Regions:
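Extended hydrophobic secondary-structure segments that form protein cores and membrane-embedded regions
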Residues: 27-32, 90-97, 125-128
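VWA/integrin I-like adhesion module and closely mimicked acidic/polar interface patches used
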Residues: 3, 99-143
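Exposed acidic/Ser/Thr-rich ligand/metal-binding surfaces
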Residues: 67-119
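…and closely analogous acidic/polar surface helices at protein-protein or active-site interfaces
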Residues: 1-25
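Short beta-strand-loop
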Residues: 24-53, 134-143
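Von Willebrand factor A/integrin I-like adhesion domains
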Residues: 50-51, 126-184
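Von Willebrand factor
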Residues: 38, 48-89, 123-136, 160-166
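Short glycine-/polar-rich loops that comprise or flank the Walker A/P-loop
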Residues: 89-90, 120-123, 147-149
Length: 184
């Protein structure tokens, strides 16, 4: 699971980096979580990222800490982008987990991030690897397509890297086009 994600991230980076429109619009950051959550890659332009930090499976799966860290990071990053005069788009988060939450308060932290009254509330597209349950992954996703289908996905270990790349490429372009290029 995590190894496939680590293998997929450089390919996704290369795909975005080769598209001048996406490269201009996208900033990427990486937050890792287990028992705690930490920013591994601060929000950066794609052209400024040389190597992705490796994700490591360890400890528990504390979703609450992940969502709290995510909200704080988005808040800081979006304010910094506003100050720099950069065109702002609603953030898009790919939430990737290889397990079920080990904390009981994660839904409250998730609700704060997903709150549509928060001006920086992100689209959350969730991706579950081998240890994650479909119902939980669906509950994490906030983004839905025009037919109301949740952008929540599951993959087994063998297919996770390919599925992650496919999902990233098929979803990110339409969301960016709708929200950033057409000014939504």
């Amino acid at each position: 699971g995590i190894d496939a994600c680590n293998a997929a991230l450089p390919n996704i980076h290369a795909a975005i980096g080769s598209d001048p429109i996406m490269n201009d619009k996208i900033r990427i950051g990486v937050i890792s979580f287990s028992d705690t959550a930490q920013v591994l890659l601060p929000l950066s332009k794609m052209t400024d990222v040389v190597d992705f930090p490796g994700l490591v499976a360890k400890g528990g799966t504390n979703y609450g800490n992940a969502f709290t860290c995510l909200k704080n990071t988005i808040q800081t990053d979006m304010v910094d982008l506003q100050k720099s005069g950069a065109k702002m788009c609603r953030p898009i988060v790919f939430f990737i987990s290889d397990g079920e939450p080990t904390d009981t308060n994660w839904k409250a932290a998730h609700a704060q991030v997903a709150d549509k009254t928060w001006p920086f509330s992100p689209h959350i597209i969730s991706f579950g690897l081998s240890g994650a349950q479909a119902d939980t992954i669906r509950e994490v996703a906030t983004q839905v397509d025009k037919k109301g289908k949740s952008f929540a996905y599951l993959a087994d270990d063998d297919a996770s890297g390919a599925v992650l790349r496919e999902i990233f490429n098929s979803l990110l372009s339409p969301i960016l086009r709708d929200e950033c290029l057409e000014g939504r």
